[in-house]
Structure formats: C-alpha cells, structure tokens
Amino acid sequence: MREKGSNIKSRLQSRHVSVGPKSAPHRSMYYAMGMTEEQIYQPFIGVATTWNESAPCNITLRRQAQSVKKGVTSADGTPREFTTITVTDGLAMGHQGMKASLASREAIADTIELSVRGHCYDGLVGVAGCDKSLPGVMMSMLRLNIPSVFIYGGSIMPLSLIHI
C-alpha cells in the first residue's frame, strides 16, 4: 500500500507532511497519535464541525462527524477531525452577545482555513447546524479550493411543552 499511497501523495498537499526524509518529524507526530503507515500515506481529509454544547442545532454534530469519518475511511482516506467555534443567534439575542454573532461567521471560516492549510489536508468535509456556522463553513471551502463536501447537521428537535 505504501507505494500506491506515495504515487497518490505526489499530487496532494499532505505530501509535505507525510512523504520523504524531510517529513520524518511530521510522521513521528502521526505515529504518536496511533496512526499506521497506511493511514499516513492515504489522502488526509479534514472533518470540521461546529459541535458544541451551546445550542441544540450543534449538539448532534459530534455523532455525525463520527459517521463521516467512517465514510472517509471506507473510501481509503484518513480522516482528521477538528472543531471550530460558533455563536448561536438564539442565545446571543437581546444582549452584548449579538455583537459576536456575525463576526463568528468570519472566525469559523478563518479557523477552518487555518487548520486545513496548517495541516496540509487534501480535502474537507464540513458539518454545521446553525445560521452563522453554515455560511462560515462554506466560505472556508471556497477559500481553500480543495475537494469539499458540506453536510447540514439537521433541524432542531421540536419543542416539548413540558420544559416551558
């Protein structure tokens, strides 16, 4: 598999952190995280989510990212999961927090772009669920101009009157 991976890697960004003598320190970091040689020589696919416990639109994204990672692995890629920030309008309304809402969209795009560029990922799957995180994730994909897939995390579960 290494030879096959090397041929694929010669055209990918991840070659800078996985192929050749100059990348030995990078590979040592991957081995320290439990990655195998086969995983290191496959394309690296970032799996970015806006998972957090601040709002119901983000709460399921961690679980969804695990499914995405299984899909990437089954397609002979190496998933690298990371999260970014999010500010939810539903909780930021009516106080100073609203000043952070629109700015969070830019921060989401910036942090995803920095993570993907900094770690030389070859592709990106973004999973988001709230109003500012959706465009923030998509903006990062446009900036990066790499193979990308956006997944909408889904709607919030219906309100239960018991909790009011």
What are the language-model segments listed below?
Residues 63-67, 99, 139-150, 157:
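A glycine- and small-aliphatic-rich helix-loop capping segment at beta-alpha/alpha-beta transitions
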Residues 25-31, 78-126:
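Glycine-rich oxoanion-binding loops at beta->alpha junctions
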Residues 162-164:
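Conserved small/polar residues in nucleotide/adenosyl-binding loops
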Residues 6-14, 45-52, 85-99:
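Gly-rich Lys/Arg/Thr-decorated short loops/hinges at beta-loop-alpha junctions or inter-strand turns
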Residues 2-39:
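N-terminal amphipathic/basic leader segments beginning at the initiator methionine
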Residues 115-137, 148-152:
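A short, small-residue-rich loop immediately preceding and capping a beta-strand
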Residues 56-57, 106-110, 130-138, 158-160:
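Short glycine/serine/threonine-rich phosphate/pyrophosphate-binding segments
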Residues 37-41, 46, 52-81:
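Glycine-rich phosphate/diphosphate-binding loop of Rossmann-like nucleotide-binding domains
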